[in-house]
Amino acid sequence: MADVEDVRAFALTLERAYEVFVRGRRKFRVGSLVFVAFSDDEETIEFGFPKDERDGLIASDPDTFSLPAPSDLRFNWVRARMDRLDPVEARELVVEAWRMCVPQKVARAWDEAHPDGP
């Protein structure tokens, strides 16, 4: 099971990433772009994910993944239950969400420094 503190510690290692609290919710940003957000109770994580791929992700494991709230459907977001994610999968999703917010050269530098992934 993925743990909020593990996700937090990992997210903060990513270049340009920082943590904020918005209306009591823990979020991680690059600049003004949010790439990860937790629910109020921190039982679900929402993360950036390409819109054209999210139906496939959700279909692959509907007990874990779901669409975001209707008000967020216009954004590149997917929601996941923390109790269904393993720590490695959570880190991979966080990196991919972060990648959507940083310049390509920053993402490439991370890839070069971490050839085996997170």
Set out the residue ranges of the language-model regions:
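Charge-dense, helix-prone N-terminal extensions
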Residues: 1-118
